[in-house]
Design a protein with these regions (language model features):
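Terminal RNA-binding accessory module
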Residues: 342-432
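Radical SAM/AdoMet-radical enzyme domain recognition
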Residues: 186, 211-212, 219-220, 225, ...
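Hydrophobic, well-ordered secondary-structure elements that form the walls
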Residues: 256, 299, 319, 327, ...
Length: 432
């Protein structure tokens, strides 16, 4: 039996798809690409935006049209957040949510065996439920491993459907995380990325903390770099920053979730910080890790209900002033079940798209300028994708993309380089 996956959304989704692929392989399936043709087609959905839901439905329709005898599966955040809507998608033979992922295998088998014509198996998340272990030892990227350490979110931001899609915070057992890190190190992975739905919430339900996990992860032999997923700035305290700065393996690249650079919009979004508080946290990280050594990335939503042109300009001024190395810009997507769905002053789609283009152009200028400012600096680069026998792409600790000629080296090596010119996509570099 052949199975193929189509994944939408965040690194957590990508991690879970990899774990599901491993689960199917361990039960006799062969994982193939989307183009090869399969007996089972699985879409792991994202529901952060309406567009994500549309892409899931479109992919299912195409899979069923081109492979009418195959079993099609819709799983993940979309059916969990909108179970009634997802259950009505005729092109999906199996519909499951974001929990109890191990059951997908059984659900698929029921349809394949003719025991059931169709299976809808969406189980609500419940308070007190435990983190679902989905072990994974192999990654599409052979140099960097993504390790899921937490699921769920206890916040209720006005725009966000994720708490509905993922349930409450559930932390993975620390021993389980460390055991996976040891397996990854033994397999040759040198960099790990700790991923989660609400990474700073790790441990609040189990009496530990993210900082403690980072400190213990750094003790695993063979792991040379630890990178963090998205962080909420208000959840980073002074002692956390001090302890993190003492972990030399921790990459000084921080994805600090912003969402807007306008205080009025942040209040409407129900984000628990101001732009001044955000900038203060960033300044403390710069002081702890070194201003020339640290980099910041973030997410920004434009076109939130009630955002005036002045609000947008204020947001853009703050965002560009923060000198982010990378900004993911999203036009606001109205999601049923969120507080903002019922807000007045919803902006037209064309205005949201126009603001998205303006913000993107502004932050790309900053990205180019920040990359250019690094020219001449020394940096360590993890070699990742070989373009030829000697030419590689890779990333610095600050997550700056680099192109370097490295004769005698191989994928997975960490090399010292001098950064050169920015070509619009990456920095050229030379081995020191």
């Amino acid at each position: 039996m052949r199975v193929t996956f189509y994944t939408l959304g965040c690194k957590v989704n990508q991690n879970e798809t990899g774990a599901l692929a491993q689960l199917f392989e361990e039960n006799g399936y062969t994982v193939v690409s989307n183009e090869e043709g399969a007996d089972v087609y699985i879409v792991n959905s994202c529901t952060v935006t309406n567009f994500g839901d549309q892409k899931s439905r479109k992919w299912l329709r195409r899979a069923k049209r081109e492979n009418p005898g195959a079993v099609t599966v819709l799983t993940g955040c979309y059916p969990q957040a909108f179970p009634d809507e997802a259950a009505e998608i005729a092109e999906a033979d199996v519909v499951t949510g974001s929990g109890n992922r191990h059951a997908i295998l059984t659900d698929v088998q029921k349809v394949l065996n003719g025991e059931e014509e169709r299976v809808v198996d969406i189980r609500p998340h419940e308070k007190g439920e435990r983190f679902e272990e989905l072990p994974m030892d192999k990654f599409a990227e052979h140099t960097r491993a993504f390790v899921k350490v937490e699921d769920g979110c206890n916040r209720r931001c006005a725009y966000c459907v994720i708490p509905r899609a993922r349930g409450p915070v559930r932390s993975r057992d620390e021993a389980s995380v460390l055991e996976e890190l040891r397996r990854l190190a033994a397999a040759g992975y040198k960099e790990v990325v700790l991923t989660a739905i609400s990474l700073p919430s790790y441990g609040i339900d189990s009496g530990t903390s993210l900082v403690e996990l980072i400190e213990k992860a750094a003790e695993v032999p063979g792991i040379e770099r630890i990178r963090l997923g998205s962080l909420d700035p208000d959840m980073l305290h002074d002692d956390d920053i001090r302890r993190m700065a003492a972990v030399k393996k921790l990459c000084p690249q921080f994805h600090l979730s912003l969402q807007s650079g306008c205080d009025k919009t942040l209040r409407a979004m129900r984000r628990p910080y101001t732009t001044a508080q955000y900038a203060d946290i960033a300044a403390k990280l710069c002081a702890a890790f070194g201003a020339d050594n640290v980099s910041f990335t973030t997410d920004v939503i434009v076109g939130f209900p009630g955002e005036t042109e002045d609000d947008f300009e204020a947001s853009m001024a703050f965002v560009t002033g923060m000198r982010f190395l990378k900004v993911h810009v999203f036009p606001y997507s109205r999601r049923e079940g969120t507080a903002a769905y019922d807000f007045a002053d919803q902006l037209p789609e064309h205005e949201k798209e126009a603001r998205s283009r303006r913000m993107t152009a502004a932050v790309e200028e900053v990205r180019a300028a920040e990359a250019a400012a690094m020219q001449g600096r020394k940096a360590s680069v993890l070699l990742e994708t070989p373009l030829s026998a000697t030419m590689f792409t890779g990333y610095t600790k600050q997550y700056l993309p680099v192109l370097v000629s490295a004769p005698g080296h191989k994928t997975g090596d960490i090399v010292e380089v001098t950064l050169g010119a920015w070509d619009g996509k990456r920095c050229r570099a030379e081995i020191v």
